[in-house]
């Protein structure tokens, strides 16, 4: 028999009754029932119940054992009686009567419990992540992550993609998020950077004559953490394809993403044909470029009902700004003053002056609007708004006014909040859409200049003719995002492959030829030697796993994440390094100056 085990802790079944076996694992919990010890023994695969009778030679040893000790058990497989079968365990029809027990490893007093999985401070969980990962839920999350990534790989390979690995030490590209810099010992005073994404390398692969590339790529960005974004490191499904147009990429990746979600959705419905929604339409209807389409609320322009009205706040906004609009956010079933006042208070908590509203009651055969806005604009305009929005008794709507470029995101947040508060969001589906036709440029109000709105390497719609003749702020890009349930899970574009156009668009964003050649010299040079039309995308692996596992925080599906302060509490990183190491790199640390 093997030194440590003949079977794992999920392997034994009723057909194994009478077999002499050896199991090893962690003591999940111990229960004393009338002097008989019942031990749940756990390993990577599952749990098996061990029974230790007081007349067994193993009993005295087992009395000393505590939770999370590692033991080896020899014993015989026995059938459980019908009344004690545990249907929640694959091994629930059997138990092992222990003959011998060997203690392989002891555990100190636990800083957090493994059994039961109560809520526990996150910093403790991260500091003792090796214990946290023993919890059944965390173990399942990590194993599901592995299964999802394996499935993605299979689908990519079946679709004709080849997996390549690109360098992790590269040049700094500071026009995006902050880089993680790596000092060079050999070339003192110079720095490598960890890649924010393999963007240039994957395009260079297309220049190198390869056709369909993918990798599960580690990416590094020195940015502030959020619940749906880990500090420091994350992983993306990175792809690139040669000789393709936008629809080719979408048509290739849509069935792959859909199949992965269907495989791991646990019965939730998955959109069968992903709709294409323009960026402008998404902002107009949903107040977001990553709309949650499970939410049935559609925002509407009701400006016409407020021109020259007696609701002077909105009327003056419309009169004083030709770009101003009034948007209505319908709230079916939200037609009571308590809910409307609660939403108004929420808006004020978000730094807004408030959230105007109307709610409708039935007076005989007629609908009556209630609230300050209805009182000011009168019955006719109030009824026209209700008719336009298709609202009934017991419904409400909320209003925002001004320049949509400034208030659209708040309108979108209001739509989300209303949908959540009124329980309008279908939690039993994954609702996908492609967002297309993004603006290529945007106005940077702080620096009074034009900036790239998204990926600077994308192809402008209309090509060089659009770049030469259009107002830059009106140019659209062949860029697209894939959104699901209010999250952006993928982003991509058709790439510019012309060196002349590359210089032109970067010049519009204030970057000279010299800067382009310095920062993107490899890609720029490659464009001069026969660059194929190409495009691709990158999908957030961590975010996909988070959605499929139904968790709200990426740390719940990541092995050894940092905390919200970008600290690795398990490995004590970042850490001080020795003076010798700094000297080798030609680095001197200056004390931080307090300017207060």
From Swiss-Prot:
The organism's place on the tree of life at top rank: Bacteria
Read off the Pfam families from this record. Answer: GAD (PF02938), tRNA-synt_2 (PF00152), tRNA_anti-codon (PF01336)
- What processes in GO biological process is this protein linked to? aspartyl-tRNA aminoacylation
Q: Which InterPro entries match?
A: Aa-tRNA-synt_II, aa-tRNA-synth_II, aa-tRNA-synth_II/BPL/LPL, Asp-tRNA-ligase_1, Asp-tRNA-ligase_1_N, Asp/Asn-tRNA-synth_IIb, AspRS_core, GAD-like_sf
Give the E.C. number(s): 6.1.1.23
Start and end residues of each stretch annotated as Aspartate: 199-202
Statement: the UniProt record of this protein carries the keyword Protein biosynthesis? yes
Query: Which residues hold L-aspartate?
Result: 175, 221, 454, 495
Where is this protein primarily located?
cytoplasm
List the GO terms this entry assigns under cellular component, sorted alphabetically.
Answer: cytoplasm
Summarize where ATP binds, as residue positions: 221-223, 488, 540-543
Q: Which GO terms describe its molecular function?
A: aspartate-tRNA ligase activity; aspartate-tRNA(Asn) ligase activity; ATP binding; nucleic acid binding
Which reaction is catalysed here?
tRNA(Asx) + L-aspartate + ATP = L-aspartyl-tRNA(Asx) + AMP + diphosphate
Keyword ATP-binding tagged:
yes
Annotated site, Important for tRNA non-discrimination, chain positions: 33
List localization entries. Answer: Cytoplasm
Q: Which UniProt keywords apply?
A: Aminoacyl-tRNA synthetase, ATP-binding, Cytoplasm, Ligase, Nucleotide-binding, Protein biosynthesis
In the record, the note on similarity to other proteins reads: Belongs to the class-II aminoacyl-tRNA synthetase family. Type 1 subfamily.
NCBIfam families the UniProt entry points to: aspS_bact (TIGR00459), PRK00476.1 (NF001750)
Q: How does it assemble?
A: Homodimer.
* Protein name, as recorded: Aspartate--tRNA(Asp/Asn) ligase
From which organism does this entry originate?
Bartonella bacilliformis (strain ATCC 35685 / KC583 / Herrer 020/F12,63)
Q: What is the name of the gene encoding this protein? A: aspS
């Amino acid at each position: 028999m093997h030194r440590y085990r003949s079977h794992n802790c999920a392997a034994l079944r009723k057909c194994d009754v009478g077999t002499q076996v050896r199991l090893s694992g962690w003591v999940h919990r111990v229960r004393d029932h009338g002097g008989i010890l019942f031990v749940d023994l756990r390993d990577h695969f599952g749990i098996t119940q061990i029974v230790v009778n007081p007349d067994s030679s193993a009993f005295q040893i087992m009395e000393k054992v505590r939770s999370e000790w590692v033991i080896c058990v020899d014993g015989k497989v026995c059938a459980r009686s019908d009344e004690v079968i545990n249907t929640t365990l694959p091994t629930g029809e059997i138990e092992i009567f222990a003959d011998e027990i060997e203690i392989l490893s002891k555990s100190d007093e636990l800083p957090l419990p493994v059994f039961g999985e109560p809520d526990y401070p996150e910093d403790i969980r991260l500091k003792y992540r090796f214990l946290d990962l023993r919890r059944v839920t965390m173990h399942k999350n990590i194993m599901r992550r592995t299964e999802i990534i394996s499935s993605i790989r299979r689908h990519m390979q079946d679709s004709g993609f080849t997996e390549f690995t690109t360098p992790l030490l590269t040049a700094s590209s500071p026009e995006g998020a902050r880089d993680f810099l790596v000092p060079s010992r050999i070339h003192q005073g110079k720095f490598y950077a960890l890649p924010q994404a393999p963007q240039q390398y994957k395009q260079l692969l297309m220049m190198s004559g390869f056709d369909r590339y993918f990798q599960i790529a580690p990416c590094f960005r020195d940015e502030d953490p959020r619940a749906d974004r880990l500090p420091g490191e994350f992983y993306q499904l990175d792809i690139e394809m040669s000789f393709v147009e936008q629809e080719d990429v979408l048509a290739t990746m849509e069935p792959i993403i859909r199949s992965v979600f269907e495989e791991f959705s646990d019965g939730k419905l998955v959109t069968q044909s992903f709709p294409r929604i323009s960026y402008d339409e998404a902002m107009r209807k949903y107040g977001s470029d990553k709309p949650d389409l499970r939410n049935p609320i559609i925002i509407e322009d009701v400006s016409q009902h407020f021109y020259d009205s007696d609701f002077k706040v909105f009327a003056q906004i419309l009169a004083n700004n030709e770009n101003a609009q009034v948007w209505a956010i319908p709230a079916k079933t939200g037609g009571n003053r308590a809910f409307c006042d609660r939403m108004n208070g929420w808006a004020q908590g978000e730094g807004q002056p408030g959230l105007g509203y109307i709610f409708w009651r039935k007076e005989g055969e007629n609908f009556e609007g209630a609230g300050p806005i209805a009182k000011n604009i009168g019955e006719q305009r109030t009824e026209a708004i209700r008719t336009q929005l298709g609202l009934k008794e017991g419904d409400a709507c909320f209003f925002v006014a001004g320049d949509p470029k400034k208030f659209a995101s708040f309108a979108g947040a209001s739509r989300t909040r209303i949908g959540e508060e009124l329980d309008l969001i279908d939690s039993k589906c994954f609702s996908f859409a492609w967002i297309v036709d993004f603006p290529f440029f945007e106005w940077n109000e702080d620096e009074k200049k034009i900036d790239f709105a998204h990926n600077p390497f994308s192809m402008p719609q209309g090509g060089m003719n659009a770049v030469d003749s259009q107002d830059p702020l009106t140019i659209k890009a062949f860029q697209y995002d894939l959104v699901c349930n209010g999250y952006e899970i993928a982003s991509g574009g058709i790439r510019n492959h012309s060196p002349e156009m590359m210089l032109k668009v970067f010049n519009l964003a204030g970057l000279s030829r010299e800067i382009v050649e310095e920062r993107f010299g490899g890609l720029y040079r490659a464009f001069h030697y026969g660059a194929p039309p190409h495009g691709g995308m990158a999908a957030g692996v961590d975010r996909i796993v988070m959605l499929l596992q139904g968790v709200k925080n990426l740390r719940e599906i990541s092995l050894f994440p940092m905390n919200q302060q970008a600290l690795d509490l398990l490995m004590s990183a970042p850490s001080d390094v020795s003076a010798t190491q700094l000297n080798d790199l030609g680095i001197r640390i200056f004390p931080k100056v307090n300017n207060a």
